[in-house]
């Protein structure tokens, strides 16, 4: 396991049962895990702190987004896939209890209309 993955897993274990979130940043040629505050009111979702994102961006090149699924499998949800597309970055997802990982890359994913939650004006 790479050092950044070990650091991300430690973060996820510390924040469980809330989702942890962070970034993978290349600083001076090395990948580093950048812890970010999860601003979501709901522990089953994550919202990266814009201040943490800006600090990471100043420190180096952001190459990926990380978050944990402490209550479910390390499998990308539709929301994860849409977020990955919007960010244009690889996403890593980890279940800290099981120690399992997955990653997804932007690939043109569009959420299906059937089964999508309806919201006025969206």
What do the predicted segments below correspond to?
Residues 68:
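Extracytoplasmic ligand/sensor domains, especially the bilobed periplasmic-binding protein
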């Amino acid at each position: 396991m790479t050092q950044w993955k070990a650091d991300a897993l430690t973060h996820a274990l510390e924040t469980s049962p809330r989702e942890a979130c962070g970034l993978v940043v290349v600083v001076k040629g090395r990948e580093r895990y950048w812890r970010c505050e999860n601003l979501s009111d709901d522990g089953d979702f994550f919202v990266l702190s814009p201040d943490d994102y800006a600090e990471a961006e100043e420190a180096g090149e952001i190459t990926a987004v990380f978050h944990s699924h402490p209550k479910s499998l390390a499998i990308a949800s539709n929301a994860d896939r849409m977020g990955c597309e919007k960010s244009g970055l690889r996403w890593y997802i980890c279940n800290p209890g099981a120690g399992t990982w997955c990653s997804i890359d932007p690939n043109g994913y569009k959420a299906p209309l059937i089964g999508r939650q309806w919201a006025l004006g969206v």
